[in-house]
Amino acid sequence: LGDVYKRQVNISVDNTHIPNGMEQDSEKECNRYSELIKSLGGIDLQLLGIGHNGHIGFNEPSDSFEKQVHCVDLTESTIEANKRFFESAEDVPRQAYTMGIKTIMQAKKILVVASGEDKAQIVKEAFFGHITPYVPASVLQLHNDVTLVADEAALSKIY
């Protein structure tokens, strides 16, 4: 992720922070990353995509919005969606560190990107449906500074 980001965005690497995916001690890395976020005064801008099931930041549908930074087992659909970034499906990690919903919601500003007709239904549910951890992105309705950047196709079910 870091290498892809650095090639695409004109922001100093010193101003970006990504969990160390090579750290084997997940509790240690989650704590380190949480403390880093706190020490820097929180997250200024949280950039998110939205998954077909409403997941954000590898936070799959569940029964809670309370998690902070944590390690997750990736679902088969998430592995499938991310294999385009790797040479083969076998190279895609099966676990990832992610900010939990609680951490995401503490960001000062959140920018959500959605594209394609296949995202239209979940965009409608997330931004105009009931707030539920079974559609994780729906919690963004409670944040005071969220911007959705989407193409016409992704917005087609809301107008």
For each feature predicted by the language model, list its residue ranges.
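Ligand-binding beta-strand-loop-alpha-helix segment within the catalytic cores
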Residues: K6-L45
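Short, small-residue-biased leader/transition segments that mark boundaries at the very start
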Residues: L1-Y5
